[in-house]
Amino acid sequence: YDLLHPEVNWRELQREFITQTCRGNDYSTYSRPNRRYMSAGRYFPSGVSESVDELIIAIDTSGSIGQQELTKFLSEIQGAVEVTSPSSIRVLYWDTEVCRDEVYGEQGQPVDQLVHSTKPAGGGGTWVGCVNKYIQEKQIQAQATIVFTDGYLGGDWGTWSNPLLWCILDNKSAKPTTGTAIHINL
């Protein structure tokens, strides 16, 4: 794909949404003393950082989404991948069902290969509820979901079990009833 420059300032969005909902836990513990001070006979706690778990990126591939829209979505995803550091990213392509599930990171391909190795699937109607249904059925434990769509969902924004960010393409009238929404232009 010939990617475009991402419109969304993902660094800013990361501060607002992703780090609030997806941040790992940083804490200190004496169970692993800081070795720098042990030679001086002092015991201080060492810092422990837990990484962000799985992030789901759900991409609308219904009939209203063409190659131009997919390229824009992938450009924005590349921007998000460059500034986040989840342990894994799960990409779900959906129309009325989840048509493809790709895992990048710990269990799959390297995250930095996502945009170049992904294979979009779908092209039917639109039912966003299939994404959360799939997440529940597969018992996917993600810290957040980012949904890329044109927002033509027939008024059904679904119910979600984890923090949600909508990236809505060229549809300022789309007003999700759940989660946080940002509008992007083609």
Question: Language model features by range: what are they?
Answer:
Residues 15, 70-72, 158-162:
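Composition- and surface-driven signal marking solvent-exposed, interaction-prone regions
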Residues 101-128, 182-186:
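Acidic, Ser/Thr-rich peripheral helices and adjacent loops at domain boundaries
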Residues 1-56, 65-68:
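Acidic, polar low-complexity linker/tail segments
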Residues 37-40, 100-103, 156, 176:
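Short, solvent-exposed polar/charged micro-motifs at secondary-structure junctions
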Residues 50-108, 130-149, 153, 166-169:
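Von Willebrand factor
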Residues 7, 70, 124-128:
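A conditional alpha-helix N-cap/helix-loop micro-motif detector
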Residues 152-186:
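VWA/integrin I-like adhesion module and closely mimicked acidic/polar interface patches used
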